[in-house]
Amino acid sequence: VKNQKILLHACCAPCSGAIVEYLVNNGAKPVIFYSNSNIYPRGEYDLRLNECIRYAKTWGVEIVEDQYDHDGWLCCAQGLETEPERGLRCLECFKFRLLRAAQYAQDNGFDVLTTTLASSRWKSLDQVNQAGFWACSQVSGVTWWPQNWRKGGLQERRNQIIKEQNFYNQLYCGCEFSQRTGSAEPSEDLKSKADPCQVQE
């Protein structure tokens, strides 16, 4: 893929560090696509985005921010709120984000799409690839790159870069439902939130 135009969907800086370094050092120069409407609250989203921007600058890599649409993401996750991590909600979340990445890749002439989600040991690699292949099947001219970014020493290098860069390293995946299974407490009463998927009268 060295001579192909690569779009790298990035979930956060800690997961991106070793992947960006590896790609650039091997002659590829990806464009980072930050599409993470799952992240809640908005301040958390911005914090993770700013860390990605900071790291991209160190490598001279372009980063593109997708529109933040948490209400749209909540509609995608509706009915799956109580699913465990690596459950059906995670699969639908990956599909939501990677479809947006695939659409951007198609519209902007990219050949290959891959994601930093595949670097996290907390995520199902099978789910990530299922979502990636599906997303690329919905567009034309974009190939899914099912790379296992946990192998070849990249997991160890990932942890080194987190320390070297002093990255903000989040305690939960991103959405308010994953807060329940992470170390962070939900920042507000989830039950009191209005349902964005219901028609308001």
Q: Where would I find each of the regions flagged by the language model?
A:
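Nucleotide-activated chemistry modules centered on ATP-dependent adenylation/adenylyltransferase
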Residues: 1-201
